[in-house]
């Protein structure tokens, strides 16, 4: 079974409320969703995953420092990196409109792209991934589920059908 690792941190609990609906969507497609707070993530966890989702609060238009640090430390591994060819995505919760939530998602996706992950855009909703302003609404939580399911379908297409690039030391 393919596995997606959801790495998250939450400041006021709002990003944390989005984690389970994303995981539910992933599981609804028959893909394992492994959820870990950023402080518990190891390199082995990341290598074992076929996809990686970042869940971060909006911090002045950027991901939380713990997320940034984790991916900075992975960069030390050199090229090609251990995450190349995996599928990546992100979601965030901000404090209010104009707080930088869209920039936070772009920052997260930029980090994932720099590590060689494959990113899928969203043509009909928030283009870069789920966004909540303060506490996630029912509409946002529903989008988290549908986004997680859509994202899991991409992982299945690329990984389970052997279309994703082979990664030395990875699972595919």
Segment roles from a protein language model:
Residues 14-18, 34, 45:
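Amphipathic alpha-helical hairpins
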Residues 39-124:
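Helix-loop-strand module that forms the ligand-binding subsite of alpha/beta enzymes
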Residues 31-41:
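A short beta-strand-loop structural module common to alpha/beta enzyme folds
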Residues 2-27:
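N-terminal beta1-alpha1 ligand-phosphate binding loop
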Residues 7-9, 36, 91:
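Short hydrophobic segments within beta-strands
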Residues 27, 31, 75-79, 113-118, ...:
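Generic secondary-structure signature for well-ordered alpha-helical cores
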Residues 118-172:
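Glycine-rich phosphate/pyrophosphate-binding loop and the adjoining helix
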Residues 4, 33, 119:
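Hydrophobic anchor at the start of a short beta-strand
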